[in-house]
Amino acid sequence: MNCRRHAPRWTVRDQIAHLWCFDHRALLSLTDPAAFADDARWLAANGGAEASVALGRAMSPGELLDVWRQGRAHLLTAAADLDPSARVPWYGPSMSARSCLTARLMETWAHGQDVADALGAIRVPTDRLRHVAHIGVRARPFSYAVRRLEMPAGEVHVALRSPSGGAWMWDDPSNGDGTGAAADSVTGSALDFCLVVTQRRHLADTDLVVRGPLAEEWMSIAQAFAGPPGEGRAPGQFTGR
């Protein structure tokens, strides 16, 4: 569990500890907003993401896996009776409980990819990737805001092929005047799209087809996860899925 992942700094142990830490923070957000606010201030003053892995480094692999799985079970139990539209605090603006839990799914999938890459494992994608893809599409404004860039006007049509072979689409596929396809679009497999928006693969190492300047710029900075701008992956760093 101490083997290094290909992304900077963290081991597989650190990945699991990070997921455990923020599953617990999500539980606080859903059940005790005041405690969440206190903890958020502590986390910001003590290293942020790096503080999230410190406890895990002091545990054995078995202990860490146990507390992570127990914590995830507690989170699922707390979420079962929630109004999906209820607002809950997070780091930055509040969000709906549904969005909070979808973000946890996205984070687990993304860090799970780091673990798979470190171990040389291949995961089989499922249609649950739609949740990750949806966050990636809706996070387009955030991808600009986190870099203090102004998002250009205009929509980008996203058309993805699901793992089961279905079609997933976001935003108007026309160019707005009824004369043809959207000027800016991203098409390809849902897996490739999710790998790019979570910054687990460089765009050049996928089969996504990116058309138009708005789409090209977005895909160069796409970021589905919260926090400062991610470092992403270098071209050629990964070629497998």
Predicted features along the sequence, with ranges:
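Short, helix-capping/interhelical loops that line the mouth of catalytic, cofactor-
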Residues: 24-81, 128
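Structured surface interface patches that mediate subunit assembly and partner/cofactor docking
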Residues: 31-42, 81-241
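Short amphipathic alpha-helical/adjacent loop interface patches that line ligand
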Residues: 19, 23, 72, 190
